[in-house]
């Protein structure tokens, strides 16, 4: 893990490694140099000596109103890295490297204006992906949020910043999320029950509880109480990039859920309880594998889900449709929204209503008929 402020890491062999930009390719890609020392302070001193020779000393910020965006973006990320979950750190680093750096890398902090940022947002909104297609408004909003954080950090270092940038907001237009119809859900349920194995039981569990795919993969049998008929969600699994910037390697990360409200206990219905109790597993280790040494990661579950949809003759959808479907069925069954919000692990009822609840046309028609009956003249 790096110490605050500089790109200095402690290696597994006990040495400290300092990284700096030595030069750049013709395309502007940075080429890094590395320094090694037996202590953090020695590595820091050697790194600062090299940077001073490059005319880019980080301890001269008070004299350097023209400090470039790249410097502050790297320093902000390193300074606050210990405050972020590992997955959050990797997410921020990716947004900086893939979107902010190509546009603002050599720009002077004080020269970045509201107009520049608006032009940047418009550009990535229309063709920000690698294939030249548009980014989602959610991703653009996330990128803008990181940019604001970096500029706030620069402002705290007495660098002039256009305050109008902080007022920019991206209007998000959420798309209707796909939900399985009742007939599609019954078709899927019939297949899962008729082909019992660990993965199919896991998919059925998501359909009946609304847990996320990462939460399913990290679920262990000791978090399921068949006697009390509930399951405890307290961790999630995902595959993320390593912290080494130049590496393309990834690793599995099992960590706490995305928020404190996502730590929750979910009651198990009598129908799901019967399936869990009948399944011939040793009921130890990970729920999906029955082993503490072998795990099944989200992309494997996603692939299985796609194959099942194909076998059922259903339209191909993302695994998250199970969560949306669960929430929608709960609303149709008139389950209390506050209760549903806690089962889903949301921090507020508003999130549940706006993001995951999609009343069907049939429910809307029934509501209108109820209104007509109420106001009709007898």
Please describe what each predicted stretch is.
Residues 172, 179, 237-239, 273, ...:
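Catalytic-site neighborhood detector that most strongly recognizes the C-terminal catalytic loop/helix
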Residues 11-17, 22-118, 281:
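N-terminal DNA-binding module of tyrosine recombinases/phage integrases
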Residues 134-137, 141-143, 156, 160-162, ...:
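Basic, Lys/Arg- and aromatic-enriched nucleic-acid-binding interface segment
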Residues 77-159, 174, 294-300, 315-318:
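N-terminal core-binding DNA-recognition domain of tyrosine site-specific recombinases/integrases
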Residues 228, 239-263, 270-272, 292, ...:
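C-terminal secondary-structure termini that scaffold catalytic or DNA-interacting sites
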Residues 187-191, 243-247, 333, 354, ...:
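DNA/chromatin major-groove-contacting recognition/catalytic segments
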Residues 183, 246, 267-315:
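Active-site/catalytic core of tyrosine-dependent DNA strand-transfer enzymes
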Residues 156, 204, 208-215, 307, ...:
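C-terminal catalytic core of tyrosine-transesterase DNA break-rejoin enzymes
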